């Protein structure tokens, strides 16, 4: 029998410039959602958020942002005193975004306001409220735990994408990966 060692939170990945912070995960989730809309994915539901662009006028508005897919320089456009096209698109998406997970909304808002988030801390805070505060968003911990599982699944998918795009395949050892990912 082989013992497993899993290093969590050692900072090695961040020290080497890998986008593996929780804030990176939230930004990655939002980018994927926004790119999906630009690519014609008018409906999305994953348990964390949902977007439905069904109104023909909204779809026309969305079409006006399609050029961003082809033009990598749009990020650098700065109109003094005006909202940039990227900011206009962010507002458009925000107007159509519905948080299906209160917990995911909480961590998204933390990233927006503080530029970082402590998912474990936010979870623990909400878990304590379940038992202490009658006006808590959650009646019992079951829904909160289910939402945590959805977030863990999305985070795992994001980290696999980071591994695929940022870590050279010759540096990965399939035997170690199998040991890490086995139950």
Q: What are the roles of these predicted feature ranges?
A:
Residues 1-183:
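Gly/serine-rich nucleotide phosphate-binding loop at the start of the catalytic core
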